[in-house]
Amino acid sequence: MNFESHAQAGQDLWVWEMAEHKTDGYYVDLGCNDARFHSNTYALEEHGWKGLLVDIVCGCENRKGTFILSDAAAPNERLRLYYKHIPAVVDYLTLDCDDATLGAFNALPWDRTTFRLITVETDVYRKGPADRDKMRTMLKAMGYHLVCGDVFVEWPEGTFVPYEDWFAFPDLVNPQLIKRFQSDGVFWKDILKQ
């Protein structure tokens, strides 16, 4: 099955592999921004996935998923209502809210939802490790496994910087795939070659 990535750092390709080419997945995309350009979920939608798209600015209204205009770090009433009705197990959570990522992370319904796979933009290269370390600590305490730490992107051209962390909930993911992609401080294209 042909899978064309739209993500900035291959997040959709990683999820596609880790979810074993699942075609009926559910995602939560916080910081969805543009409908297609650098979208972590658009290609998954093209393969049958559906979900919730949230951003503080318009841009994803024409997607198959449900778009909510809200600050994910300070959810409005509509977003809080949707959080009450998302599945107990969500296949993929993507967090890319720039400086509000930690706030969006903290606002999620962790008490009633388990996320099979998570990619979270940490921007360690520009913000330092404090927010990344807080999220890592909280996710580890909830039973998540850091599969790919400090995933590197090339930005600007010719410069490689730590950008994201990718997690899995081990009880919901093939352990051989966790082992296959296990890495730290690796350029995203090299992770996907494994």
Residue ranges and their predicted role:
Residues N2-F3, D123:
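Active-site rim elements
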Residues Q11-W14, L79-Y82, V124:
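A broad, low-specificity signal for short, low-complexity segments enriched in glycine/proline
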Residues A19, E77-P87, N106-D111:
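Short amphipathic alpha-helix with an adjacent loop that forms part of the alpha/beta core around
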